[in-house]
C-alpha cells in the first residue's frame, strides 16, 4: 500500500506551527516599531508646527552702526536702506537671530481703539499707564515730520532701568523700529553691551513718505536683549499711533516699556521659596509648584521638570533637578535642594531656575527661566533681598517664566 510520506511524517505539523508562530512574532515586532516611529514623528512635527507660529524663519537685518539711518520709499513702495556705513560690514549670518513675530502682528489689531491725543513726556512727568506687574524700564525718543522733504524722523535717545536678561546680571539692549502695519521693513540701533541704562542718540529717517500715509501708521519700538548664541530676548515695547501726535515739530517722549506681545508672558509661573542660613553658609531652594505652563507637545500638554543651576562669577558650580511630571501644566513638585554658598561669595552668586519639557526621543525643550541674584530683574532682586533680610526663614514668591 502507498502512503504519502508528508502525511506520514510526525514532524510536519510541528514545523507548520513553528512557521506560523515566527510570522506572527515578526509582524508584531514590526508593528511595535512602526507605532513608536509614528509617535516620535507626531511629537516632533507638533513642536515644530507650534514653533513656526511663534518665530520668523528669516534672519534679522544687519545691526545698525551709524548715527543716522534712512529708509527711502520710492514710487513703487519698496523700502530700501540708503545709509550704508563706510568702513563697516554687517553682522555675519551666524550672528543674526529670529525674533517673535506675533509681538508685531498682534499689536496691529490691538491698537485700533481707545486712542488719545499724546503729549510729549519729560524726565519727571512720565505717567505710569495702568498697573504694570513688573518694571521693564523706560525709553526716551523723539518723532517729527519734515513736510518739504516728505520725511518722518525718529530719534532713539536712551533707556533707563532695563531689566537684566543675562545670568551675569546685565543685558545687551538694542531697539527695533517699525511703522505698523508694515512688519517687513525695520530699522535697528546699535547693541549696547552690558548696559541697563544705554544711550543711543541715533536718528532714523523714513524718506519719501507722504504725510497722509504717515498718519495712518503706528510707531512701534521694541527693545531686545541681543544674544549671539540663541534667540534675542524681548525686554519691552512702546507703540504710538502717529495720527495722535503733533508731527509739525520734533516731539520728545518718555514712555514706560510694556511686556512684548510675543507669547513670552504665557509661559507660566513658578512658585519657589529661598531659605538662607548664614551660619551654615547654605541656601535651600524649594521648588513648590507651577501654574499655566506653556504646552509644548502636539497634544496640548507638557512633561515638565525643573533644573536648578548654582552659578558663581558666571561659571556653573552645581546642578540639581526635580522629577518629571507627566502631562501636567499645573504641576506640584515640593522638592528642596541645598547649596553651599559662603557669605563672602553671595554677591557673585546667581541661581538659575529652568522649567523644561521632557522628551524621550528628542532634545528637551525650555519652557521658561528665572534668574535669582542681587542684580537680576526687580521681582527677582526683591526675592533675593527678602531672603537675606529674613535668615533661616523660607521666603516664597511667584515668578513669571521668561524666554
UniProtKB/Swiss-Prot annotation:
Phosphothreonine: modified positions: 58
Domain C2: 135-255, 266-399
Chain sites annotated for binding Ca(2+) 2: 166, 225, 227, 233
Feature: compositional bias, Basic and acidic residues: 90-100
Membrane topology: Single-pass membrane protein
Signal peptide annotation: none
Task of the protein: Ca(2+) sensor involved in Ca(2+)-dependent exocytosis of secretory and synaptic vesicles through Ca(2+) and phospholipid binding to the C2 domain. Ca(2+) induces binding of the C2-domains to phospholipid membranes and to assembled SNARE-complexes; both actions contribute to triggering exocytosis. SYT7 binds Ca(2+) with high affinity and slow kinetics compared to other synaptotagmins. Involved in Ca(2+)-triggered lysosomal exocytosis, a major component of the plasma membrane repair.
Protein name per its UniProtKB record: Synaptotagmin-7
Organism, as annotated: Homo sapiens (Human)
Higher taxonomy: Eukaryota, Metazoa, Chordata, Craniata, Vertebrata
